[in-house]
């Protein structure tokens, strides 16, 4: 009986996913660099079913939140909070985009066709369906990283000094601006310029407060200009 209980506990830990321990100085949020050359509108990506290429210029005039996601991570529960965030802030011009990635702890191992069923029946489960667009699985770091992630990372300083445990990170070469783990977030403004970058442990509620605060400041500046 004790062995069965021990095995059950071990399985629960494995299913709960893995989030790397805190190492080095971390910041919940970083403001992106000024004077960025180019915009996110120069890029695009294929939807998760592979049927449509969406140019990001389609989102011109919107605030766009880029999130690298994974189905078997200790942070996968953020999917539910991201759904709520999308619903709440869509009237204010926010669009969330999700990019599955298997480079952190191998926590997105399935094919593209398996990701949505996993979210629906396994994690978060309970019939969950994301209300924001997911794109094809791809790399966010390393030699084969998607070019728009190169742009985002070069536009914003990292939120942590250290990358983490190397045996849980699957890319080369490693660079100082690389994404540290699943569910790191970048906010891009209505002009296509990156604004903020959040650490993966920053709660979605804090991300929401930061976004709303920025929107209010921009609205106030607009009123002053008039």
Swiss-Prot record:
Keywords: Oxidoreductase, Peroxidase, Secreted, Selenocysteine, Signal. Residues 1-24 form the signal peptide. It catalyses: 2 glutathione + H2O2 = glutathione disulfide + 2 H2O; tert-butyl hydroperoxide + 2 glutathione = tert-butanol + glutathione disulfide + H2O. It is an enzyme of class 1 (oxidoreductase). Its EC number is 1.11.1.9. The active site is at residue 73. Gene3D superfamilies: Glutaredoxin. GO terms for biological process: hydrogen peroxide catabolic process; response to oxidative stress. InterPro entries: Glutathione_peroxidase (IPR000889), GPX_AS (IPR029759), GPX_CS (IPR029760), Thioredoxin-like_sf (IPR036249). One of its GO terms (molecular function) is glutathione peroxidase activity. Secreted in plasma. Homotetramer. Belongs to the glutathione peroxidase family. This is Glutathione peroxidase 3. It comes from Pongo pygmaeus (Bornean orangutan). The gene is GPX3.
């Amino acid at each position: 009986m004790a062995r069965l209980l021990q095995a059950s506990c071990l399985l629960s830990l494995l299913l709960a996913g893995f989030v790397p321990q805190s190492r080095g100085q971390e910041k919940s949020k970083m403001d992106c660099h000024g004077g960025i050359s180019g915009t996110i509108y120069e890029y695009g990506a294929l939807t998760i079913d592979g049927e449509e290429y969406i140019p990001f210029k389609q989102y011109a005039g919107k605030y766009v939140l880029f999130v690298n996601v994974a189905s078997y991570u200790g942070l996968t529960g953020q999917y539910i909070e991201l759904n709520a965030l999308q619903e709440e802030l869509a009237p204010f011009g926010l669009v969330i985009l999700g990019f599955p990635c298997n480079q952190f702890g191998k926590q997105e191992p399935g094919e593209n066709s398996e990701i949505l069923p996993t979210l629906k029946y396994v994690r978060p489960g309970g019939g969950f369906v994301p209300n924001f667009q997911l794109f094809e699985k791809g790399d966010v770091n390393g030699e084969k990283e998607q070019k728009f992630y190169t742009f985002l990372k070069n536009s914003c300083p990292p939120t942590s000094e250290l990358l983490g445990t190397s045996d849980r990170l699957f890319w080369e070469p490693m660079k100082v601006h690389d994404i540290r783990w699943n569910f790191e977030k970048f906010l891009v403004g209505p002009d296509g310029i990156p604004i903020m970058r959040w650490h993966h442990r920053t709660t979605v509620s804090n991300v929401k407060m930061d976004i709303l605060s920025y929107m209010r400041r921009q609205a106030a500046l607009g009123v002053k200009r008039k």
